[in-house]
């Protein structure tokens, strides 16, 4: 994410002339998986970078106030508001305790499984104002760790999934549907497709951007910049 933001904020006039590649690492790297990159086969990723097959892809942009100034942060995968960002927060904390990424991720999921905390939220999507107590919102240029499974990182659109609080039995069915890539069929999930999202309010909700916790003050304005950067993709 730092590399993407470095490119997007550089003084280079045509940023698509800069190509970047991915050597996947970590847990749940579904942006890499979308392109067929295997976390366990870094040698193949290096070979693909050397072969240099290029594809222009979209870049998401989040405008916000960081407490001192208005600023922007760019992303390739997704922004989470609420539960998804809490998982990032807790997994970072438990990683310091456990020392193992996989164990910290599973521990954070378990700790939050029964929390199902709701946040008073006000969104504006395609001119529609959405108000209510919402568990999590995912705004994805790509698949967003499974919550925006229909998103395509080069179609010029943002996919949005607004998730309301499920009953406990619905939570388990939702987890199964998430793993199967069918989360949009869950009755507590409302999907949208748009080019701009305004998050006017999400009371006490954490926000993560491509796995980073964002120090922010609402409102947020999330937009998409079509084919703004060049990715080296597998053959």
Where do the model's predicted regions map?
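Phosphate-binding core of ATP-grasp and ATP-grasp-like enzymes
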Residues: 136-145, 151, 181-182
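ATP/nucleoside-binding phosphotransfer catalytic cores, i.e., glycine-rich phosphate-binding loops
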Residues: 124-126, 131, 155, 162-235
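Short, well-ordered alpha-helical microsegments
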Residues: 3-5, 145-146, 216
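Catalytic core of DAGKc-family lipid kinases
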Residues: 5-138
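Anionic-ligand binding region
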Residues: 119, 148-149
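Aspartyl protease active-site motif detector
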Residues: 1, 24, 211
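Short, acidic Gly/Pro/Ser/Thr-rich loop/turn segments
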Residues: 83-88, 142-147, 167-170, 206, ...
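Gly/Ser/Thr-rich active-site loops/lids in small-molecule metabolic enzymes
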Residues: 95-103, 150-170
């Amino acid at each position: 994410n730092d590399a993407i933001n470095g490119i997007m904020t550089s003084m280079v006039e045509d940023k698509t002339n800069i190509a970047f590649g991915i050597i996947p690492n970590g847990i749940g790297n579904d942006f890499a998986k979308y392109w067929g990159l295997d976390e366990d086969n870094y040698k193949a990723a290096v070979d693909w970078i050397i072969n240099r097959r290029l594809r222009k892809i979209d870049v998401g942009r989040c405008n916000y106030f960081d407490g001192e100034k208005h600023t922007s942060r760019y992303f390739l995968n997704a922004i989470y508001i609420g539960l998804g960002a809490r998982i990032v927060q807790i997994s970072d904390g438990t990683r310091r305790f456990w020392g193992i990424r996989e164990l910290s991720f599973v521990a954070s999921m378990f700790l939050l499984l029964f929390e199902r905390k709701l946040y008073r939220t006000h969104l504006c999507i395609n001119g529609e104002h959405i108000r209510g107590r919402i568990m999590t919102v995912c705004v994805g240029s790509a698949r967003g760790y499974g919550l925006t499974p229909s998103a395509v990182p080069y179609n010029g659109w943002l996919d949005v999934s607004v998730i309301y609080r499920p009953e406990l039995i619905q939570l388990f069915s939702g987890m199964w549907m998430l793993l199967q890539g069918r989360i949009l069929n869950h009755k507590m999930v409302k999907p949208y497709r748009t080019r701009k999202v305004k998050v006017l309010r999400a009371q006490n909700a954490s926000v993560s951007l491509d796995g980073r916790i964002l120090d922010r003050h609402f409102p947020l304005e999330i937009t998409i910049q079509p084919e703004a950067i060049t990715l080296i993709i597998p053959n």
